[in-house]
Amino acid sequence: MTTIAARSLAVLLTLLLAAAPLQAQALPKAPSSEAVGLSAERLGRITTVMRDAVRDKRVAGTVTLVLRDGQVAYFEAAGSQDAERGTAMKTDTIFRIASMTKAVASVGLMMLVEEGRLSISDPVSKYIPAFAKTTVLEELNGRVAVVPAKRQITIRDLLTHTAGISYGAGALEPFYTPAGFRMWYFADRPEGMTAWIDKLATLPFESQPGERWVYGYNTDVLGNVIERVTGQTLAQYIETRITTPLKMVDTSFFVPAEKAERLAAVYAVGEDGTITRAPEGHLGQGMYTSGPRASFSAGAGLLSTAHDYARFMQMMLNGGELEGVRLLSPTTVKLMTSNHVGTLYQNGALGWGLGFEVVEQMGRAPRYGAAGEFSWSGAYHTTYWADPAEKLVVVFMSQLLPAGPVDLTRRVRTLVNQAIVGPPSGMPAPATTSTGKKAPARTSGQ
């Protein structure tokens, strides 16, 4: 075969593969929960708690997925996807994942770092010139004033949320609201993110770069860096570089028409702790099916399923690889899941890496969390975490905004951890004492 013919055949095969519909790739199922060191009886407590929450009208429905050693040990839906329409919650229901988008975008950014196309030490202004001279709202001599930033913001500042950029609440609201910013929501905007990020650069920020941990539009700025470096929209980049290779077939910034019936409804929790259907609009259902598909928020824009997101997190737990597809090196994953901010976040009780909350020491965190765990959550009462020591990935989905007193995301942590009764498959049995007896079993607690 000639070189030209060989190249033509390769191009043809590539086109055929691109035209073929992407098939969902199911994660392997554990033979039993006990086979991977999880108690079936104790996992059943998750089912009970979620069904009780549905019965008491504290949530319409939930999906919980537990992976151990890369195998599905628990995957159950409870309640309704849309109570008013009588649609039952299913394990393939699609959810608005809000800030769980940040991890995906951060991985996308670090892939470009690995390729040598940018550095985390670079000033943001290298890619977004409007960030060359930013300002900060400060209190000086009892008066509030807008002052120049002491230094330029770097890519690392954005990844660690130490750029000083908030969501524009509090004292900054008089600047941000007239400029058209509405917290983290961009789905209904006809402009691309470049226009919004350039506008953001003209507004004062909450803190000087590097001085505080401030949660806000940091990852949205990173998303626009990706767009400017690659020449693609963020949606195109994430689809071609992350979701398609990982076979995350139901993850996107807007729900395709043929999947619209799988999108869960959003509910708001009232003062009495019970739910009502949330209104339309940016703090309710949102325009995730009918929006203009122009602004792709790296900070809060994706929709996904529990299974898709578990595939993404298993890739991270594997050190950047899943089923032969490598997105990152193990060294980069370790860098991303290490604390970069000292005691700036949660007074040191927890740390913050490059896109993830991290646990440095069990017992210091105000909840369950083993050293090395990395996690985050979303505004619609969703959460995820990966525990390298336990070879554990957990994804929990619901759609509450606001969630009010409902705290199922914290409870599911307890419920999963109390079900760990042994090592994952392929790991040695628990250590024995000097008398030859097994060491005391792990106990549960709040």
Regions found by a protein language model. Give the residues of each.
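Active-site SXXK
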Residues: 44-51, 64, 70-72, 94-128, ...
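N-terminal secretory signal peptides that target proteins for export/translocation
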Residues: 1-5
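Short, gly/Ser/Thr-rich active-site loops of penicillin-recognizing serine hydrolases
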Residues: 318-322, 331-332, 337-342, 361, ...
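Short, conserved catalytic-motif segment at the N-terminal edge
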Residues: 28, 32-97, 119, 133-140, ...
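Short, surface-exposed loop or secondary-structure junction motifs
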Residues: 134-371
